[in-house]
């Protein structure tokens, strides 16, 4: 039996939020979703998620900066950066900002694999 992670989704596209929620809800607890970086920082403090699925391009700000701030303040919270742009430079910058994974939005299986690596007792 695997542990259910508390997941917060940060994406400004409601269809993406709905799809990711459905994908993850079978094995994890989606505790909330937000559409802006400002709301994200507030939600992290209130909801205390284990994992954040963070869109690279939130409309109100710098997702990489938010990732950096979250991982520095909340060392137990992990961030998976989620983007439709698989540019190696962006991937590098995401990992430098503290993301534990960078996942292409087009491949849901990659997101599931990233979560499997986060659950204690699972190895890939």
What do these predicted ranges mean?
Residues 1-8, 112-124:
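Non-catalytic signal-transmission and effector/linker regions of two-component phosphorelay proteins
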Residues 14-32:
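Two-component/phosphorelay signaling modules centered on CheY-like receiver
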Residues 47-53, 58:
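Active-site beta3 strand of CheY-like receiver
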Residues 65, 86-103, 109, 113:
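Alpha4 helix (beta4-alpha4-beta5 surface) of REC/receiver domains from two-component response regulators
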């Amino acid at each position: 039996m695997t542990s259910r992670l508390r997941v917060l989704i940060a994406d400004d596209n409601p269809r993406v939020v709905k799809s990711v929620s459905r994908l993850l809800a079978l094995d994890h607890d989606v505790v909330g979703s937000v559409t802006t970086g400002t709301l994200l920082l507030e939600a992290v403090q209130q909801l205390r998620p284990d994992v954040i699925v963070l869109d690279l391009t939130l409309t109100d700000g710098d997702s990489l900066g938010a990732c950096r701030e979250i991982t520095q303040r909340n060392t137990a919270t992990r961030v998976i950066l989620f983007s439709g742009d698989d540019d190696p430079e962006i991937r590098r910058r995401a990992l430098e900002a503290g993301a534990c994974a960078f996942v292409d939005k087009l491949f849901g299986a990659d997101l599931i694999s990233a979560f499997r690596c986060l659950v204690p007792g699972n190895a890939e």
